[in-house]
Amino acid sequence: MSLARGHGDTAASTAAPLSEEGEVTSGLQALAVEDTGGPSASAGKAEDEGEGGREETEREGSGGEEAQGEVPSAGGEEPAEEDSEDWCVPCSDEEVELPADGQPWMPPPSEIQRLYELLAAHGTLELQAEILPRRPPTPEAQSEEERSDEEPEAKEEEEEKPHMPTEFDFDDEPVTPKDSLIDRRRTPGSSARSQKREARLDKVLSDMKRHKKLEEQILRTGRDLFSLDSEDPSPASPPLRSSGSSLFPRQRKY
């Protein structure tokens, strides 16, 4: 049977093997009854014939399915080809700007004649255009040279500012400050305003030197500098030393 037959042929081809298989089985039964002397040989021949019939039916069935599958696939290729044929070309600017009637714009012949006559007479045509007002120019970006010129000016202004003393100012030879040991309590009748005090490094250094000097004086004489200034001992009398227990309890002599 050929594989190119239609649906009717495939149905007939499937029905024919079934009838043949029935005939084969009936023939096998008849052979089994008649051939009593060689049952093994007849049974082997019957099995071979049965297997051959089954292989033929399987081949025909698979061929029919392939034929049925080819029919819808051929029909499905047609819409795919139609889809691939769909294409579009965008319109040009002139086609988009066409008027409603579809004809391109063209000046009337009388206007064309008038313009040619003006060109022949005057040589040039006056441009008919609306002159729009001008806007102010855009300020130009500042160049790097101008910026570099402005930076020294800013530095000069900073240098011209008066220097304010701070606690970190240091002089090689600090000026000895005034005596700051005087009690600065406000006396009755004086102004309540107090002078603003600023911390300066030279003052800190001078205070350190003064305290060191006081310590050396106390260690050398055993008396405080204030007591020496307040008392006026006579030069003949020896200096009175205070007991070491009052000033230096740890420096007693035994």
Swiss-Prot record:
Residues 1-111, 127-254 are annotated as: Disordered. Residues 116-160 are annotated as: Sufficient for interaction with NCOA1. One of its GO terms (molecular function) is nuclear estrogen receptor binding. Keywords: DNA damage, DNA recombination, DNA repair, Nucleus, Phosphoprotein, Transcription, Transcription regulation. Residues 78-98, 142-159 have a biased composition (Acidic residues). The modification Phosphothreonine is found at T138. One of its GO terms (cellular component) is histone methyltransferase complex. It is found in: Nucleus. One of its GO terms (biological process) is DNA repair. InterPro entries: PA1. Residues 161-254 are annotated as: Sufficient for interaction with ESR1. Ubiquitously expressed. Residues 45-62, 195-223 have a biased composition (Basic and acidic residues). Pfam families: PAXIP1_C. Its association with the histone methyltransferase MLL2/MLL3 complex is suggesting a role in epigenetic transcriptional activation. However, in association with PAXIP1/PTIP is proposed to function at least in part independently of the MLL2/MLL3 complex. Proposed to be recruited by PAXIP1 to sites of DNA damage where the PAGR1:PAXIP1 complex is required for cell survival in response to DNA damage independently of the MLL2/MLL3 complex. However, its function in DNA damage has been questioned. Component of the KMT2 family MLL2/MLL3 complex (also named ASCOM complex), at least composed of the HMTs KMT2D and/or KMT2C, the common subunits ASH2L, RBBP5, WDR5 and DPY30, and the complex type-specific subunits PAXIP1/PTIP, PAGR1, NCOA6 and KDM6A; PAXIP1 is required for the association with the MLL2/MLL3 complex. Forms a constitutive complex with PAXIP1/PTIP independently of the MLL2/MLL3 complex. Interacts with NCOA1, ESR1, NR3C1, AR. This is PAXIP1-associated glutamate-rich protein 1. It comes from Homo sapiens (Human).
